Design a protein with these regions (language model features):
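Intrinsically disordered, low-complexity regions
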Residues: 1-191
Length: 191
């Protein structure tokens, strides 16, 4: 299983001018990273998942009040990982593509952002890359992560499906460590 060392850190550069969503979008697009632009635009021009939960509870009523707020550091982190993934894909460096998407998935799933649905989006990209390249350890890790995030969201059926796939891959590879990890998660989600 690929290990992610905690939550990725976001470096702070206090001397740089504060970018806007628009300026970063333009910079990404002008640099020729079309897919990165699309993903960045979506990530920075959507409703705040926390505010959306507030709508259900009746706490917010205005669309403008629900727009996600993204700091300069977060924009830099997203831009760097998205463009690195796209550039690496062009070069055929699938390990770096996987790692960049994994960084984004972990970032959105954990910490203050706490947006597991966006984490799922990037873990699914990891799974896609792993399948395309026959990366068994990467596929096991992505299935494990998708199972865990679906568990976190309360979607037991999906969690079980991903953990069972993780178990199948672990058995096929003969990795007892992976089988143990998949079994542990299956027990957690089943109880």
């Amino acid at each position: 299983m690929r290990a992610t060392e905690g939550e990725p850190t976001i470096p702070v550069d206090s001397a740089a001018p504060v970018p806007t969503k628009r300026s970063v979008c333009e910079e990404i697009l002008a640099s020729g990273y079309v897919q990165s632009f699309v993903d960045f635009f979506y990530l920075t021009h959507r409703q705040d998942p926390k505010a959306t939960a507030g709508i259900v509870a009746g706490a917010a009523s205005s669309k403008d009040n629900n727009d996600i707020v993204v700091s300069a550091e977060e924009m830099k982190f997203m831009k760097e990982n998205l463009t690195r993934a796209e550039e690496s894909r062009r070069k055929g460096d699938t390990d770096n593509v996987y790692n960049s998407y994994s960084n984004l998935a972990v970032y959105f799933q954990r910490g203050q952002v706490n947006d597991p649905k966006t984490g799922v989006y990037f873990y699914e990209k990891c799974l896609e890359i792993a399948k395309l390249t026959s990366d068994g350890p990467g596929e096991m890790s992505a299935n494990h992560s998708l199972g865990c995030v679906h568990q976190q969201m309360g979607n037991s059926a999906a969690a079980i499906r991903f953990h069972e796939r993780h178990m199948e891959l672990a058995r096929a590879s003969g990795s007892y460590r992976e089988m143990e990890g998949a079994a542990r998660e299956l027990v957690k989600v089943s109880c």
